[in-house]
Amino acid sequence: MAEYDKLRLEWDCRRGMLELDKIIMPFYLEQFDNLTETQKATFVRLLACTDLQLFSWLFKRARASDTELQQMVDLILEKQGVVINN
């Protein structure tokens, strides 16, 4: 079982784009503790991505080439009740 620095993760959830903050931070605060260890590790990897990548994925402009990252994006959108109509 991995140990996660909660303060560091919360800081990493703060992004340079308000649109991302409104999706990622609430997901972290409400859902992170309920994720599996694999999902937690994937979420941490997702936070290492650029804001531009996250925006593209979360607003369905593109799909992540990494299947695990795309599954996490889909989970975030589902849990946060985000509906993006393209």
Swiss-Prot record:
Protein name: FAD assembly factor SdhE
Keyword Repressor in annotation: no
Classification via InterPro entries: SDH, SDH_sf, SdhE_FAD_assembly_factor
One GO location term (cellular component): cytoplasm
Function: An FAD assembly protein, which accelerates covalent attachment of the cofactor into other proteins. Plays an essential role in the assembly of succinate dehydrogenase (SDH, respiratory complex II), an enzyme complex that is a component of both the tricarboxylic acid cycle and the electron transport chain, and which couples the oxidation of succinate to fumarate with the reduction of ubiquinone (coenzyme Q) to ubiquinol. Required for flavinylation (covalent attachment of FAD) of the flavoprotein subunit SdhA of SDH and other flavinylated proteins as well.
Gene transcribed to yield this protein: sdhE
SUPFAM superfamilies referenced in this protein's UniProt entry, alphabetically: YgfY-like
Major site of localization recorded for this protein: cytoplasm
Pfam families reported for this sequence: Sdh5
Cellular compartments annotated: Cytoplasm
Gene Ontology biological-process entries: succinate metabolic process
Family: Belongs to the SdhE FAD assembly factor family.
